[in-house]
Amino acid sequence: MGRLALISVTDKTGIVDFARQLTEEFDFEIISSGGTAKTLQSAGIPVIKVGEYTGSPEILGGRVKTLHPRIHGGILARRDWQSDLAEMEANQIRPFDLVVVNLYPFEQTIANPDVTTAQAIEQIDIGGPAMLRASAKNFAHLTVISNPKYYEQYLSQLRQNNGEISLEFRQKMAGETFALTNAYDGAIAAYFASLNGETTRFNLAGNALQTLRYGENPHQSATWYGSGTMAQGWGKATLLQGKELSYNNLVDLEAARRLIAEFGSEEPAAAILKHTNPCGVAIGGSLVEAYTKAFNADAISAFGGIVALNQAIDEATAKELTKTFLECVVAPDCSPEAQDILAKKSKVRILLLPDLTTGEKQTVKVIAGGFLVQAADDVVETPDEWRVVTEKQPTPAQLAELLFAWKVSKHVKSNAIVVTKNQTTLGVGAGQMNRVGSVKIALEQAAEAAKGGYLASDGFFPFDDSVRTAAQFGIEAIVQPGGSLKDQDSINAANELGLIMVLTGIRHFLH
């Protein structure tokens, strides 16, 4: 008898050509089930159906097809154990040389926001993972392939090794398979956690998208993984031009995406970041105005920065973008005319990400011996929910300015202070160990332009020194979360100095 392959795939990419080469070039017999058998038979490839081989028909609407001793015995049998071989002979079980299986599209199914629980459950594969895990466990005696990208490598192994498959390759395929089943079960567990609330286990899995040149620094290795279906996110971004993305590029781009997402897409907005902190953010009457305002907010820091735009890049904006060196520019789209202009700066990475507003619902940080998971800080706030605590009341226009400053402060490393005017950042104080230190940095950067401006603080003021410093620079209104035992001291200082103060009740620390 020739070699025996078991093929049962949902993703039929390349399966016909692969099966044809197995049968015609290497004398494989193929056992297959359901839609895979029909696909191969319609292509003229001889197939033994699972039901014919096992003597048991598919039952329960196809829920039970391959869960049979003649299938799993042929997968799990140890070819160097006489007792296993004797049992196989007694039960007319043939050993498989190759198992090719991929799984029902569970993650793609639950990516649909309208999917019902019943629909999701029907896409939980049972037989597929069972065959994959059994095959991977027994890699010493057979090969398992769970991804079409390995079909050609398997054929090359046969050709180069006189029809044999190396143990190294079989072990590699086993590892890939266990990683797949782990991720698949993790997605199912995460789905049920979303239905039931918090769970005692958290699974984090992904597919390697790219081996990066290095991490934050040249001596650190790094890999980019994609999670879930990647229906959104950077794995779906189009790189129009420029070199491949680096680790630092991706970290900065995600920070820029989160910030620009605050402003939706109706009003043109631009953000420029360095080392994940904004150095210039603005809203304008046009995209080019928004970008120009953001750039001029801190032209020195903008050099080599990451730019995020919430509308398609037009010709006028493209011309401004080419006037300085930038690492990356991301926008939802780019006109052909703008592309031609940007091409003159071929080293600038231009990315298109149509949906800049959709991000992960959780954030993860690795610590020694584990990791921390928290809900993303994606709360949507409006001034209607805020509390004015000073005698002086803000106008609607002033509240709009405070909201702009508040949105930006959320994306600055704590302790964070943002000074703005005309919906443009004037000064950003980031990452200082005391809040008044960040206040001074932001105000000194804004300098005389701070007069009549607005100040946002991501955390409360422990003392009134920040308020008094702001008043010295002519700040008109302050927005902060409140919550200090000495809130009243800051409120009293604001009243004494004629400032407006608004408390949001929500803190936005960023570490």
Swiss-Prot record:
Gene Ontology molecular functions: IMP cyclohydrolase activity; phosphoribosylaminoimidazolecarboxamide formyltransferase activity
Protein name: Bifunctional purine biosynthesis protein PurH
Organism annotation: Microcystis aeruginosa (strain NIES-843 / IAM M-2473)
Record keywords, A-Z: Hydrolase, Multifunctional enzyme, Purine biosynthesis, Transferase
Catalytic activity: (6R)-10-formyltetrahydrofolate + 5-amino-1-(5-phospho-beta-D-ribosyl)imidazole-4-carboxamide = 5-formamido-1-(5-phospho-D-ribosyl)imidazole-4-carboxamide + (6S)-5,6,7,8-tetrahydrofolate; IMP + H2O = 5-formamido-1-(5-phospho-D-ribosyl)imidazole-4-carboxamide
Pathway: Purine metabolism; IMP biosynthesis via de novo pathway; 5-formamido-1-(5-phospho-D-ribosyl)imidazole-4-carboxamide from 5-amino-1-(5-phospho-D-ribosyl)imidazole-4-carboxamide (10-formyl THF route): step 1/1; Purine metabolism; IMP biosynthesis via de novo pathway; IMP from 5-formamido-1-(5-phospho-D-ribosyl)imidazole-4-carboxamide: step 1/1
Any single GO CC term annotated in Swiss-Prot or TrEMBL for this entry: cytosol
Domain remark in the UniProt entry: The IMP cyclohydrolase activity resides in the N-terminal region.
Keyword Transferase belongs to the record: yes
Limits of the MGS-like domain: 1-146
Family named by the database record: Belongs to the PurH family.
